[in-house]
Amino acid sequence: GKILFLVDDAIFTADFSIADIEKILDNNRDALGFSLRLGKNTQYCYMMDRKQPQPEFTSPADGILKFNWTKSELDFAYPLEVSSSIYRLAELFPLLLRVNFNNPNYLEGGLVRFVGQFVASHPMLLCYDTSVAFCNPVNLVQTVSLNNRVSSNKKYTVDELAALFDSGWVINTRFFDHVIPESCHQEMELSFEKREAK
């Protein structure tokens, strides 16, 4: 089996097939996982606020990239993340049993502690040529990692977004169709539309 991790600010920008990703993972046993947030387009590391070098890619299938995360930098060197990646349960389930968590930050922090055990056995990571997901960090909704970098735009506070929703407005997700972000995390303006009456 496989497991897909997602967080509440993850946005999909293009169609993808989980069934295809499962097959690719099965055919690339040296890969730890498949990142939906990485690609040749992710040339900037938002969390560190700097450009990131691209790893040396190979292409095991059409539109798919493979790289050695143990020889990479920044986002490309961070293989265990919970924002938008798919992993095999065989590798992840034993870790999940050992991690004490009650939110995504604690889960990711707990998983990262075990990354060293995969350096020899699973040094590769897979992704699409162009990422199909990114996180839009418009606000901070948790209190355990207050140093997480987020937008300072006051119109996207939790209270402001809740007020818009209560007034019948929702985020227009079509606005993000085919967006090609330069980073795994990228602040983007939100577009709103009136919620359809049911």
What are these regions (language model features)?
Residues G1-I11:
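Short beta-strand-to-loop acidic/aromatic patch adjacent to the donor-nucleotide binding site
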Residues L4, L32-F34, L126:
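Hydrophobic/aromatic beta-strand patches that form the interior of the parallel beta-sheet core
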Residues L6, A61-G63, W169:
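Generic detection of intrinsically disordered/low-complexity segments and helix-coil linkers/edges
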